[in-house]
Amino acid sequence: MKTKFLIPLILFIGLVVFLAIGLNRDPHEVPSPLINKAAPAFEIPQLADGSKMFSPANMKGQVWVLNVWASWCVACREEHPVLVELAKSQMAPVIGLDYKDKREDALAMLAKQGNPYLLSAFDGNGRVGIDYGVYGVPETYIIDKAGVIRFKHIGPLTMNLLNQKIYPMLTELKKS
């Protein structure tokens, strides 16, 4: 008779513990198997000039920021002023990856809101995004001088995140 009540009680307590652990985690800090691994290689056309190609190999020897965005993404529009601020800081080059978008829509958005990117690569079919494990846009990566991903953030950047995490990390990575 006691076992009849004990098993559901243990299951209930286990479920509560599991849910409590999940609630204490930051939803933007999704573990990525790419952290501390070489950034996936690719070569795709640039957004502004489709005859020019971009590859992460072009950035070897530099600490840089890769921001995955799209013109149809509301959160990307929300984070846009923060990216402009990051670009103005000149802490690191900011490269855009225009993800599953229409070239003309992306160019129109950048013309209207300002272009924080040194350049944007055009990933119209989303294949590069798949290699990077993109959950959704926006996503931001910090890549070190050796081409290794050191940080991934899912969701829009904020000024607080820039000041608390990104600027200090860029400063530290530039030293090494």
PLM region descriptions:
Residues 1-45, 176:
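N-terminal targeting signals for export/organelle localization
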Residues 5, 111-116, 123-174:
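Thiol/disulfide oxidoreductase modules built on the thioredoxin-like
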Residues 24-25, 45-51, 120-123:
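Short gly/ser/thr-rich secondary-structure transition/capping motifs
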Residues 38, 62-64, 68-72, 136:
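Short pre-active-site segment immediately N-terminal to redox-active cysteine/selenocysteine motifs
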Residues 40-43, 69, 95, 130:
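Conserved Rossmann-like nucleotide-binding pocket used by diverse enzymes
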Residues 42-65:
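A short beta-strand-turn-helix
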Residues 65-67, 96, 142:
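Hydrophobic beta-strand core positions in alpha/beta domains
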Residues 77-114, 124-130:
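Structural microenvironment flanking redox-active thiols in thiol-disulfide oxidoreductases
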